[in-house]
């Protein structure tokens, strides 16, 4: 992916209201690939004072959104599955990497 096209995706994430609200930043993008990061803050706590699964899932979904749409065609998720292993530490930088493994026109 050329530099100009990458810049378009960085700008899209910077301007996306939800990504801004969550503090999600695009770190790298290529065709079928994206890396996003987000700092875990107190505002992302669940009622047990651990990271809310929805906050973590939002980071994952953002990386997926960018990688799957990096071919200039709108793509959507039909299904996503997450296994949460253990909660992150407060203030830690969370990272989501999305790699496309197959692209077809069929569902």
Task: Place the predicted regions along the sequence by residue.
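Terminal targeting signals and extreme-terminal segments of soluble enzymes
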Residues: 1-107
